[in-house]
Structures are given as C-alpha cells and as structure tokens.
Amino acid sequence: MVSKRVESLLNQLRTQGIVDERVLEAIALVPREKFVDEAFEHKAWENTALPIGQGQTISQPYMVARMTELLTLTPESRVLEIGTGSGYQTAILAHLVHHVCSVERIKSLQWQARRRLKQLDLHNVSTRHGDGWQGWQARAPFDAIIVTAAPPEIPTALLAQLDDEGVLVLPVGEEHQFLKRIRRRGNEFIIDTVEAVRFVPLVKGELA
C-alpha cells in the first residue's frame, strides 16, 4: 500500500507519459526523502529537482523515470551510471537490474550515496570515484549507460563502452540541452533526440 503522496506522484508520471510499470514500481519503492537534506524532506515526493550540495541536484522524478524507461532494461542488463550524485537514480536502477556500476566525480557525494544505498539494503551497486567522461573501462561493455549531467558533446569513451545493441541515454549541450537516446549497431550509432532538458554540466577531468 503506497501513501497518498507517492500515489499522487505516480499518477503525475503516468499523465506525463511514463508507461513502464516496472519503472513506476521502482519509483514507489525508493524513499526519495532519504536522498535529500532534512530541510527538503517535505518536498521529496514533489515532481521537482532539489539541491543536494556541491552545486549538484537530485533530478525531478519525471526525468529519472523518463531516462530509466528509455534504457529499456531487463534484470540481466549491465548498467553504468555516470554521476552517482545523491544515489537516488542509482537506487531506482538497483531495483530493476542485478547489478549497477556508478561513477561519481565528487568524493563526498560518492560516500554519502554509498551509505544511503547500504541503509536501504541495496548491495548490488559498485561505486567508483572518477571522471565520468572516461566511463568505467574495466567493467565494460555495458548494455545500458545513463548520464545524469550534461556534457557539451557525447563522450567518445562512453560510446566505446556500449555493447552491441546497447543504449546510452544522456543530456547533451551547454546553453541549450537535449536528452538523447543512442543505440549501438555494430560500429554505427543511431541517435534520437527526445526532448529539451536542463541539467548541471558534466565536468571533465578534475576530481573533487
């Protein structure tokens, strides 16, 4: 039995076009209030992005659901997340697949996310402090890659780490950003533009 706040959010997401019931179920199961500061707990089930410190945000539930749905995951999918952030998107993925790999540039966010995931008994996640532009070569190839910050162009390392028929979902751009879905077919990449979005930038190289 879900609360009225959760049911209200799920109904909003359905109205906005989210149809994958597995994704909606994962949204219902993950307590978003555990991934935000205490000052924002009362807003946790609103369909809005919230600050998490270090100039980063927790994405609005619609965007989390949309990007997750676009990955077309199965339980066996090998998934890479770029930008662990609060760990909320990571937790959604962890409910949908057997294992998630996640890279975070900011060490303090990585540690906070790991703690939250353990508190929720989500032990099927590997996190790494590193440059998201470089992906996670040692764990490649991946069936699905999701990027939760916007690079100005598509990182070539992430394309290289996609398995054949794998899917990459990410926001791309600086002033004007668009959500892209990229499917690999051999050495070709089929790129679809989904919708206009607004994300924090994917910072290259420098770790924090």
Curated annotation (Swiss-Prot):
Its EC number is 2.1.1.77. InterPro entries: PCMT, SAM-dependent_MTases_sf. It catalyses: [protein]-L-isoaspartate + S-adenosyl-L-methionine = [protein]-L-isoaspartate alpha-methyl ester + S-adenosyl-L-homocysteine. The active site is at S59. One of its GO terms (molecular function) is protein-L-isoaspartate (D-aspartate) O-methyltransferase activity. It is found in: Cytoplasm. Keywords: Cytoplasm, Methyltransferase, S-adenosyl-L-methionine, Transferase. One of its GO terms (cellular component) is cytoplasm. GO terms for biological process: methylation; protein modification process; protein repair. Belongs to the methyltransferase superfamily. L-isoaspartyl/D-aspartyl protein methyltransferase family. Catalyzes the methyl esterification of L-isoaspartyl residues in peptides and proteins that result from spontaneous decomposition of normal L-aspartyl and L-asparaginyl residues. It plays a role in the repair and/or degradation of damaged proteins. NCBIfam families: pimt (TIGR00080), PRK00312.1 (NF001453). This is Protein-L-isoaspartate O-methyltransferase. It comes from Klebsiella pneumoniae (strain 342).
